């Protein structure tokens, strides 16, 4: 069943890419494993998932330990990260999807033993309930990260508003792509910013149409 559900999602990715003449290889599927146990996450890995995401530090560390026999897994931390937990996690992950303040970046820089690929979280929709910097703050924030030499800004991340129309979701994701292009055009060495992390289970088709390169999906067990 897991393999069937995974194949269904991969087919949906291919179909969405075909609509806008994109190569499916440009899109990385990240499985959100926060709602499954380690044994089920292992089934996903055995079915071909190589990117796993958690939104809690303790759960990611637990699953990484349980899946020690699969060093090829790329681990993604999504969601808000408290500064006091930075030291516990930053050297255990491959990607961080929610960089949104200089204080957090400085703490990450302080604790890192190796380079970490980070996405800057941008609150494109302007919802007060969402984390992330405002679009107006983006360029100054990117420039301020130059001193954090172990942080590599690989791209931008955003989430669509809840209960939004397809038109609204297209606008949010399209705006993030425009912001990504703006940063990329600056040619910052510390911020190549070639990636877009946007789209979850309910809206990743729209995200792909708007240029997403990383999508987060719950894969039903």
Language-model region placement:
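Divalent-metal-activated hydrolytic enzyme cores
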Residues: 213-215
């Amino acid at each position: 069943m897991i393999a069937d559900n995974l194949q269904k999602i991969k087919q949906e990715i291919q179909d969405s890419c075909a609509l806008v003449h994109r190569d499916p290889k440009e899109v990385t599927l990240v499985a959100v494993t926060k709602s499954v146990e380690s044994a089920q996450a292992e089934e996903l890995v055995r079915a071909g998932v190589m990117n796993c995401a958690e939104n809690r530090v303790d759960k990611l560390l637990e699953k990484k330990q349980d899946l020690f026999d699969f060093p090829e897994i790329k681990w993604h931390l999504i969601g808000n990260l408290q500064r006091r937990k930075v030291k516990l996690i930053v050297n255990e992950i491959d990607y961080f999807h929610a960089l949104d303040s200089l204080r957090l970046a400085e703490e990450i820089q302080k604790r890192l033993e190796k380079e970490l690929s980070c996405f800057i979280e941008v609150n494109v929709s302007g919802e007060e309930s969402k984390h992330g910097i405002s679009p107006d703050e983006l360029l100054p924030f990117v420039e301020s990260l130059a001193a954090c030499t172990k942080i590599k800004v690989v791209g931008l991340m955003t989430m669509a508003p809840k209960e939004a129309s397809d038109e609204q979701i297209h606008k949010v994701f399209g705006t993030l792509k425009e912001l990504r292009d703006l940063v990329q055009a600056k040619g910052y060495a510390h911020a190549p910013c070639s990636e877009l992390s946007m789209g979850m289970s309910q809206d990743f088709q729209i995200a792909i149409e708007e240029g997403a390169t990383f999508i987060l999906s719950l894969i039903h067990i």
